[in-house]
Amino acid sequence: MIEIDITKDMIGQCEAKAKDIGRLRNSITKGKGNLAGIVGEYVTHQHLKGSEWQNTYDYDLIENNKKIDVKTKRCSSKPRDNYDCSVAETSLHQDCDEYIFVRILNDLSKAWILGRMGRDAFFKKAKHMKKGQVDKSNNFKVHANCYNLTIKELNTL
């Protein structure tokens, strides 16, 4: 897990891009998480020195010819390794090769790049959860149909 302090300059660079996106179709947070999502992409792009920031409908970054979708969740504290990383069922159409998962504090002061996993490997290992279902491993109530995998099961960057 890589911890990153987020600066006002970083947020400033991401704000215009987040506004341009507007409300994404199939967004669990109805567009309220756009800035956090863009900051997640930004810090991941900065960490992956050779990556290209594409921000398409299907993926966010390209690294070594792999299309990477960055999945960001907001949080209120440092993530623990038993917390889940999720891919919403509504994102299954996305044409990417790999996922990188990020958590960002609600106040946007800190981010954690949690790990990565190839798309096919993720869905082979992930647990399918339905909206309203409570995950017994962490008592989290699922907000949308999704596939979950714990942070400790991810590959490191």
Task: Give the positions of each predicted feature.
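Nucleic-acid endonuclease domains
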Residues: 1-66, 71-157
